[in-house]
């Protein structure tokens, strides 16, 4: 029988065509198996959250503890408010219980006994406000205390009096421009490299140090010491001569504070997150100009054959797990009831690829309209629409959550990224009250000129939602991005980055949707 079948096969005139057909069928079966595997793939890790009523905000965690640090400020001096606000947040995140005395409202003679504290933080440029109390502080340091000057000091008689003790050989009345900072290699993570400032100005006092000083950071040109320590008998002083204050440099001041005493330990987050905004989402149709020119393929093919394989290689090389935040459609309808997306193929395919890569799915929006009510005025900044009421906001999120479960049933999402980083007070309250599936909000960490973005601090909010802002973005590493990344790596031991899949379709980045 077998021989008979073989003779018939040999005489069959279309056998070559059958072979080709068999090859195509084999390829189809492989692709089908791969697609099914992608669709039902799930992450190999699970996220475990504390119950919302068990999560404790940082302020509550140190409330009632005895203050170990005394912060002396003089709010009547220029720039003190900004520096004080920065240091308060730094100390809160480092979990350092702090008592604050404002010399604009309190006589120096009424400063509490320094023996109650381990450290004294002086946040004022002109030390004259301390009067004779400055002498008492230096005696306390000699006996084993630790003092830090957080602001660039002004040259006065009081600075000249303590200068030799805190490592200053000589100083001038002039200030020099500090274009960047170079930490010592063993002082900070990322030390040994230079990080440039945006909008530098003459912020650092021109001075020379003596042999007591141990320099921890210098200016970009290496000429000006910016952070140094000096041992004073049994105690230690640290001086900051940066003169720039704000979120983007907190890590440098936290590192400076950690120099006080023989050792400093403080809690950090120790995590990294890499977000793919608008992913998965409806894939744009057509041919982007540069994709068509350089690759000769459609956007959909470019995503699957070039862009995603490249990201997978990066992920494998550096151990990255991407978090893709899903958007169901790019419509602008905020008034009608949500309508289910009909084309689910892109979502299940690219979402499955993400899960297969051991990534995570998050939420971005039913559409790309931020969660704001009619009382939010976009002005000339955006052409977005407002949602008519809280009920509509909840309905949009409910549809997104249901859609995610429909196309990626194996995934469990918990993080929400606001479109364009915009989230109103009412929208934020609605999430905490009515959408228990959202446990984390990842908006923006660094402030901008606009009042619309939802700017966050790392921590747990009163309603138990984790505030986990994103820090840097895009594919082009600029000076500001490097500075922010370095600072936060040393402040919270955190690295967060986000990018848009369609950034590569544009001549310039970032995307107009900007989140």
Predicted regions located by residue number:
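Conserved small/polar residues in nucleotide/adenosyl-binding loops
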Residues: 507-514
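Metal-dependent polysaccharide deacetylase catalytic core of the NodB/CE4 family, i.e.
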Residues: 68-75, 141-143, 149-161, 316-426, ...
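A glycine-rich, often tryptophan-bearing local segment used as a flexible ligand/cofactor-contacting loop or short
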Residues: 127-194
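Active-site beta->alpha N-cap acidic-glycine motif
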Residues: 245-255, 259-353, 357
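Catalytic domains of cell-wall/extracellular-matrix polysaccharide-remodeling enzymes
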Residues: 23, 28, 389-462
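N-terminal Sec-pathway targeting helices
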Residues: 7-26
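Helical hinge/lid and interdomain linker segments adjacent to catalytic or ligand-binding clefts
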Residues: 79-156, 305
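A glycine-centered loop/beta-turn motif at secondary-structure junctions
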Residues: 64-69, 117, 146, 204-271
